[in-house]
Amino acid sequence: MRLCIPQVLLALFLSMLTAPGEGSRRRATQARDTTQPALLRLSDHLLANYKKGVRPVRDWRKPTTVSIDVIMYAILNVDEKNQVLTTYIWYRQYWTDEFLQWTPEDFDNVTKLSIPTDSIWVPDILINEFVDVGKSPNIPYVYVHHRGEVQNYKPLQLVTACSLDIYNFPFDVQNCSLTFTSWLHTIQDINITLWRSPEEVRSDKSIFINQGEWELLEVFPQFKEFSIDISNSYAEMKFYVIIRRRPLFYAVSLLLPSIFLMVVDIVGFCLPPDSGERVSFKITLLLGYSVFLIIVSDTLPATAIGTPLIGVYFVVCMALLVISLAETIFIVRLVHKQDLQRPVPDWLRHLVLDRIAWILCLGEQPMAHRPPATFQANKTDDCSGSDLLPAMGNHCSHVGGPQDLEKTPRGRGSPLPPPREASLAVRGLLQELSSIRHFLEKRDEMREVARDWLRVGYVLDRLLFRIYLLAVLAYSITLVTLWSIWHYS
């Protein structure tokens, strides 16, 4: 007992000697803490023992909920050939980090702090449709609130795959999706929700640049839980970006020139079919339309899986021009046969000049009445045979007989030639007159045949013109109706 008392006294003495040193060190530490900025002290406090490789929850059974938001800023490019959409968006996301919480009163009432993104845990949320790295600005910081809420704001240039349907070009509406999902974590680890309500996301066009070729209709969000196998399920948030092309430029540069050329082709039917000007006019028009298609070929979207309807429209217009040229060649050939032309058959005369002319309200097309060819030939032969003179008074009274010769002044005032010489002279004269009459009748007959074929050609030309006009109008009305439905639906 006597030995313990000195030991106790020695311990008390030593504690009295060391107490002033420890107090001075504690006071020095407190002085140093108050001299440092609050943000620096808070950053050191939060990141001193932080492990960014671990999901920031105290209970591993609790999932980390990540709320995301997308605001469309601009449509930069729509590549129909490669099926790629380039957009510029404002992307926002926030989650709760349970390891980044503090009491604001301990740090000069600081409620939020910006810290480097590389220093903390960040969810691995990616876009499934990524096909290329966009030129997005780098934002290296995030905001952390005292309750552990982490806010990550950043603009993104997205180059994503999109199934583009160009059949309705230039009145097409495209629906492209942006699918945000965790590449590794299942829904038991990371769950995805919307930052704002779906109605606010759909109607938000506040920052969209609405001066380009494309018009933003809406951004429709949809949550979906999918699974690759039975045990693992993943959360994804899909944003459907619905855009519509402004068709005014393409209507002016593509549709109007084609419509003008087709109207000129229709007006070309006013040229008379018996002139050669219509054929050269149609050929020039067809050549001009071919040059027009070569010029606009680079403007049309080209894909390997489909052709726009406007491309079909151009091909059909080209086919109609070819049909119009073929019809013109047929009519010109029909009315220009002339000497080689046979008389119009009775069935064709009845069909075209009676029936079709009446249907087209062209009035009755008169046909020249010609006696049969056999009658004319027999009549000519009666006046040129060897028995001409004996029968002259009966069958050739239209030329004149010997009695008429006797009544002439020459016959009364001069002696008559011998009967033999008179008969030869009359025979030669009658043969010449018969040849002249035969030539004139043949010429008149050929002219009447040509006129008949010309009438047939005019009627067929009117018929084919109206059929062609109906085909052009029906095709144009169908396309305009379809494009109007697609544009205003």
Curated annotation (Swiss-Prot):
Residues of the signal peptide: 1-23
Keywords: Cell membrane, Disulfide bond, Glycoprotein, Ion channel, Ion transport, Ligand-gated ion channel, Membrane, Postsynaptic cell membrane, Receptor, Signal, Synapse, Transmembrane, Transmembrane helix, Transport
Ranges that cross the membrane: 247-273, 279-297, 308-326, 467-486
UniProt KW Ion transport keyword: yes
Cysteines paired by S-S bonds: 162-176
InterPro entries in alphabetical order: 5HT3_rcpt, 5HT3_rcpt_A, LGIC_TM_5-HT3, Neur_chan_lig-bd, Neur_chan_lig-bd_sf, Neur_channel, Neuro-gated_channel_TM_sf, Neuro_actylchol_rec
Residues with glycosylation annotation: 109, 175, 191
Superkingdom as given in the UniProt entry: Eukaryota
Extracellular side: 24-246, 298-307, 487-489
Complex and partners: Forms homopentameric as well as heteropentameric serotonin-activated cation-selective channel complexes with HTR3B or HTR3C or HTR3D or HTR3E. The homomeric complex is functional but exhibits low conductance with modified voltage dependence, and decreased agonist and antagonist affinity. Heteropentameric complexes display properties which resemble that of neuronal serotonin-activated channels in vivo. Interacts with RIC3.
Stretches the record annotates as HA-stretch: 425-461
Single annotated GO MF: serotonin binding
PANTHER family given in the database record: NEUROTRANSMITTER GATED ION CHANNEL
Protein name: 5-hydroxytryptamine receptor 3A
Record note on domains: The HA-stretch region of HTR3A seems to be responsible for the low conductance of HTR3A homomers compared to that of HTR3A/HTR3B heteromers.
Key word Transmembrane helix present: yes
Family membership noted in the UniProt record: Belongs to the ligand-gated ion channel (TC 1.A.9) family. 5-hydroxytryptamine receptor (TC 1.A.9.2) subfamily. HTR3A sub-subfamily.
Cytoplasmic face residues: 274-278, 327-466
Major subcellular site: membrane
One GO cellular component term: serotonin-activated cation-selective channel complex
Protein's job: Forms serotonin (5-hydroxytryptamine/5-HT3)-activated cation-selective channel complexes, which when activated cause fast, depolarizing responses in neurons.
